[in-house]
Amino acid sequence: MQQNIERNQVSMTTSRFVWGAVMALVALGSASAAELNLPDGAALYRARCGTCHDNPQDRTPARDVIARNSPAFIMAAMNGVMAPMAAGLSEAEKQAIALHLGARPAGGSQEINPHAIWGPPSASMPLDGPKCKGKIPPIDLSTPDQWNGWGAGITNARFQPNPGLTAADVPRLKVKWAFNYPGSKNGQATVVGDRLFVTSMSGAVYALNAKTGCVYWRHDAAAATRSSVHVVQLPAGAPAQYAIFFSDWTKAAVALDAQTGKQLWKTTIDDQPGVQMTGSPTYHEGKLFVPISSGNEAFATNDQWECCKFRGALVALDALSGKVLWKTYTTQKEPAPFRLNKLGKQMWGPAGGSIWSAPTIDPKRGLVYVATSNSYTEVHHEGSDAVMAMEIETGKVRWINQVTKDDNYIIGCPRAANCPEKVGPDFALGNSPILHTLQDGRQYIVVGQKSGAVYAMDPDNDGELIWMRRVSPGSELGGVEFGMAADAENVYVGISDVITRKGGKPGVYALRIRDGADVWAFPAPRTPCRWNNIFCHPAVSQAVTAMPGVVFAGSMDGHFRAFSTSDGKVLWEFNTAAAPYKTVAGKQADGGVMDGAGPTIAGGMVYVHSGYAGRSTQNAGDLRGREGNVLIAFSVDGK
């Protein structure tokens, strides 16, 4: 614990230094690098940045996208999420690059709003909605229609059996309220009783009234977060009656008092190079299971980065104290030097195998299941692109089913010096395994892949493959991305295929879980968008959600649809980006690209995010863009 406290103190010191550098650039305003006696920013950009940003691929923003941001924002990025790519640059060199690229406001530095910089200063911002009036009611975990955590249960089926509305009600859904908040990506809504909990990349964690959107409290975390919240009743004598758990994007798991938002504990659980935690934690019988992922795929585009020392992992903590109980890596082999890259920098392996999604609990077998992503180097990684089973009590790996071997991938190949000798297709398993019980009592593990494949595995036979169905050709940004949903008969599959080398098949597909047979298909149509970039696309990357008779799915073009589970007929459709919303704060906000965290259903209402990572602006990747960052609450007739 002392070590964790010391690390947090170091992190706070570093954050103050970084923020000081950012504020310095804000103060400099429209000054040039030459006036400030800085190095040649143009030359530094060509040498360190141009290879990727002048020829962008996949998730890399183009130079003109970066240039729309202020020098202060670019400086914050180089000292934050882009720090690995900026490794080796002095502060003066970073300032020179930022001033070379960044937009300078006509009115001088006073027009640069430091609070608009992507990061954790949410504490300095006004509350994002009206404060709830009156006495705060107690948390009620007894309600049958709650949506708690990522998958609405430890099996991660993303199915709401008690939605509080029927399939016949769905065509009458209308917007009841909208909530707009800072941060380029946001966590999925958790709804328990009248309480809605949600996280954001601004560092703010909110407790809202689920029916009205008013704010009970806002906790200003020290780091961005995009995981879903899990609400738990603590044992008698604990410092709070109820706690919420989440992980931040950097290195910590956090517990807050669900009633007040006060921090109960915070534990550093990983400090590997380039760690970025996106998957949501899962709670079970006093233990919190937190997945570990990274940004090494992008960081390795920096030719000076020692690629790669990161291994995906699952961490189990005591939910009451935050004490780490065990930690299991997706490969048991520690990364070791194996060759030099094209520029003579040391390379390491095995590396990779991030866990991007929430773990799945199997109490019957005493196991926890995780799905893993690609490897980064050509050193064999037995736990990449796989489903892994670990013992709940010890973390011991019971079995691994690797569906794609040697999928060695980083962004920017073949240009980047750190590229594997043979580059893989990046067919990660980025969604949670679904533990499904058939009517005859047998259980299957069902999981999707960015290859467009869906797999059913046998938990009684070490994950042996039962069936595989290739729904689409897939790609780095294709196939199954954030999550599927399952009811008693079918699994509902959202297909992205926003970028494919063959004919993509974006849309929603239903497969019979018993044998993988096709039930129905909805090839999503192309529709115009407010924004003009590659993310004006019918891709269904956002996680899908089901209730009796209905499956909900959002697409990147902003369309939110409800389908009949029996035949795929569209029951209801709403364009979340067609018109601005008047938010609960009385301000105007826009919807946009739908991606990442999926819809949640509880108490007769449906909640969904519209807007993702600045992709709804004319230049995808402008994280300061104000368009597309809203939580929308729907109810029957808007009542």
Curated annotation (Swiss-Prot):
Give binding positions for heme. Answer: C49, C52, H53
Q: Please name the InterPro entries in this protein's record.
A: Cyt_c-like_dom_sf, PQQ_b-propeller_rpt, PQQ_rpt_dom, Quinoprotein_ADH-like_sf
Listed EC numbers? 1.1.2.6
- Which cofactors is this protein said to need? pyrroloquinoline quinone
Q: Does the keyword Iron apply?
A: yes
Hey, what's the signal peptide range on this chain?
A: 1-33
Task: Please list the residue ranges annotated as the Cytochrome c domain.
Answer: 36-152
Q: Which GO terms describe its cellular component?
A: cytoplasm
Q: Which Gene3D superfamilies match?
A: Quinoprotein alcohol dehydrogenase-like superfamily
Full protein name: Polyvinylalcohol dehydrogenase
Species source reads Pseudomonas sp
